[in-house]
From Swiss-Prot:
This is Transcriptional repressor NrdR. One of its GO terms (biological process) is negative regulation of DNA-templated transcription. The keyword Ion transport does not apply. InterPro entries: ATP-cone_dom, NrdR-like_N, RNR_NrdR-like. GO terms for molecular function: ATP binding; DNA binding; zinc ion binding. Its cofactor is Zn(2+). The gene is nrdR. Pfam families: ATP-cone, Zn_ribbon_NrdR.
Length: 163
């Protein structure tokens, strides 16, 4: 690694730590010529995923586009930007795990919906209403009723013994 201070190519790693999520390694280095200390980060370089749109056009997966959708859904809700950033990273990791080169845009929408359901119910309803193109109040009521039913069932399912 080239020293950022003097340009020398030889250094020594004095400390390495893995990030909490296990995707990045932080390394403290010292230049063997000038003793300047600096930090580097090492990550796996993933192949770029392409998004297949409804009209079969393809474009690069855009992290910012996913984040904008989450931010819009969570507008004026008690959800931190850190939580939304984590959700985007989780979505992208899941997409890379499940798809090699291309991912349908509908799959991204489903992942966003899953994350929002766990983060904030109002944000979930906002996003789903646009994603599924709700056209009347009945569709909102139906979705909310389904959410309530799911909320009642989930705690019961967790207590059932596995046979």
């Amino acid at each position: 690694m080239r020293c950022v201070q003097c340009g020398h190519l030889e250094d020594k790693v004095i400390d390495s730590r893995m990030s909490k999520d296990g995707t990045t390694i932080r390394r403290r280095r010292v230049c063997l010529r000038c003793d300047y200390r600096y930090t580097t980060y090492e990550q796996i370089e993933r192949t770029e995923l392409r998004v297949v749109k409804r009209d079969n056009l393809r474009e690069a997966l855009n992290r910012e586009k996913i984040l904008r959708g989450l931010v819009k859904a969570c507008e004026k809700r008690p959800v931190s930007m850190d939580r939304l950033d984590r959700a985007v990273e989780e979505i992208i990791s899941e997409l890379h795990r499940d798809h090699l080169r291309e991912v349908p845009s509908s799959e991204i929408g489903k992942k966003v919906i899953e994350k929002l359901y766990a983060i904030d119910p109002v944000a979930y309803i906002r996003y789903v209403s646009v994603y599924r193109q709700f056209s009347n109040v009945e569709e909102f009521i139906q979705e909310i009723t389904q959410m309530r039913h799911q909320t009642l069932i989930d705690p019961l399912q967790r207590k059932l013994p596995i046979l």
